[in-house]
Amino acid sequence: LLGEIHGNAILKQAGKIAFDLIEEIKSKSLVIRETNSLLEARKLISKLDGIETKDLRLLIRAFGVYFDLLNLAEQQARVRSLRKKEMLNNDEPLRESVEAALIELRESGVKGCEIHNLLQSANIVPVFTAHPSEARRRTVLDKLDCLALCLDRLEYEILLPSEKNEILDSIAEQIETFWVTKSVRDDKPKVIDEVRQVIETVMDSLVKIVPRFCRDIDYALTKVFPGEVIDIPAFLSFGSWIGGDRDGNPFVTHDVTESAIKLNQETILKYYIKQVHFLGGILSHADLFISPGQKLIDSISNDKSLFPSDDSGNINEPYRLKCLLIDKKLKNTLTYLKTLKLSWGSPVELPKNIYFHSHQLLDDLKVIADDLLSKGFSNAGNGSIRDLICLVKVFKFHLFSLDIRQNSNRHGRALAEILKSEGVLENYLQLDPTKKLEFLSEELNKNRPLIPARLKYSEDTCEVVKTFRTMASIAEQQNPEVLSTYIISSTTDAYHILEVLVFAREAGLFSIKDNYSLIDIVPLFEALL
């Protein structure tokens, strides 16, 4: 279907000569694939060598679209196959499913309590990067998404003839415009564009898949280990390097890191606001028919005290009222975030009517869920609110945690300049590794500040210092959960880690005296011989 419509679009837009050329190349390629004929391959190469540049461009464009459509068709076929297997298997779990894995573990002697203990210590963090292999524009990806939806409707819906024709017309429209759409951008995207692109690419899928994944695990555990209480913690989260990986990329600065985190936060907050509004529409239980528990009553009362002029106090639907109050706090949090100007070294008093930590939102949602379950509303208590709780556990208030990465050489050069400028040490870079370790160990045990509040160093050194100060400011004023990992690339010695600890101490991220660290340092040993 897709190939036929694609061919018709080429025939209409580029003409019969172009269409025949593309079909000839396609058929010759298929023959080579089926026969592995070296002679046919040489004939094809000879044919391509004789084609003019403008026609080669047309060929490249045609086959680019063709392979995108072919990949889409293969994805649809795989989904169709999986759905068919699940329908035919009835109670039998699918191969490689969560349930199948748990059955295999049970049959090998693993007990439910062992699964419980494993889950409590599990921590799975898929990390997104701005991978150069995905250079397609958002416009192209949107067209493919639209085509996938159309194919789903043709496959799974019972359609009237007029509805089927409408879908076929929509497919033809998308492919016709796809053929004349630029597949890649004209200019290189900025870092913040890459952040936005990843959000646009994965956000819609993740917020649908994650709750389903949590439900699949819960269902499988209950079925495979009946009667055993196995708590499912938040063992899954997502990370990103985009906006945090500054190793070799001068465009990733402390300002870009701040902007990337803010964009991720704003995105997930807006999504939560939409979901809470939807939830309030579902939970329309009237107090004429139910009596809310004391914990919910107290929670509503506490929230009302945060909004003295609130006019929602007369609503006689307690769960909806609580959702409205959550909505207000989320919107206040979003406003606070948008107007926030980070200020390192200056104490900031956080507003009381915002969410700062994700557990605050989780507590509010759990109050509603627990009350629903205690009143016998098991479907509502285990329905949409449970999915939202799952999302908050996974994405918290930052969508993706951001890993900061910098090359070890940048830290060493910056520290050497600071030590010389402050009259502490003239020749830090000339010290051997053992001497550096001794010096840095002594420095970390001193209470004095090494770096003044006002920076007077080179641009590169100031950027290193500002990165750590930005991390500290974000943890204190914006989001305490988003930044936890600092990656040192090209690590070859232990002193590389101590250099980072010095900068972390100076920013307020680490202290030996007070026994705390707000970051986990991750050395990369790719430079070791």
How does the language model describe each region?
Residues 184, 229, 244, 252-254, ...:
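Conserved alpha/beta-domain cores
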Residues 1-442, 460-463, 484:
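Often metal-dependent polyanion-binding catalytic scaffolds in large enzymes
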